[in-house]
Amino acid sequence: MIQPQTHLNVADNSGARELMCIRIIGASNRRYAHIGDVIVAVIKEAVPNMPLERSEVVRAVIVRTCKELKRDNGMIIRYDDNAAVVIDQEGNPKGTRIFGAIARELRELNFTKIVSLAPEVL
């Protein structure tokens, strides 16, 4: 469950290392974001000499959360960290690689480019 002021790791090579959620895209008063939701975030930590810089406002899609994700078949998935992938306005990732496992639910939400770049889909 991601809410405003939550810090997230970045699961791609876009140049950002850590994000802080400042808004959840969707309804005007949504409190929490889950896997597959798009957020507005600010870059808190970045790699030097990369296109994305610190204090830049970006959009990101959440790919991993510590909070459990229940599937229809009864399976529960939980990750060790909260992570997101930086995306552009069309929903394509800004990086060219994805690190770590991501959930299968992203394919159903039309983030197929992120799913194709991921090394493991759970």
UniProtKB/Swiss-Prot annotation:
GO terms for cellular component: chloroplast; large ribosomal subunit. It comes from Nicotiana tabacum (Common tobacco). It comes from the Eukaryota. This is Large ribosomal subunit protein uL14c. InterPro entries: Ribosomal_uL14, Ribosomal_uL14_bac-type, Ribosomal_uL14_CS, Ribosomal_uL14_sf. Keywords: Chloroplast, Plastid, Ribonucleoprotein, Ribosomal protein, RNA-binding, rRNA-binding. Binds to 23S rRNA. Its main location: plastid. GO terms for biological process: translation. One of its GO terms (molecular function) is structural constituent of ribosome. HAMAP family: Ribosomal_uL14. Pfam families: Ribosomal_L14. Disulfide bonds: none annotated. Part of the 50S ribosomal subunit.
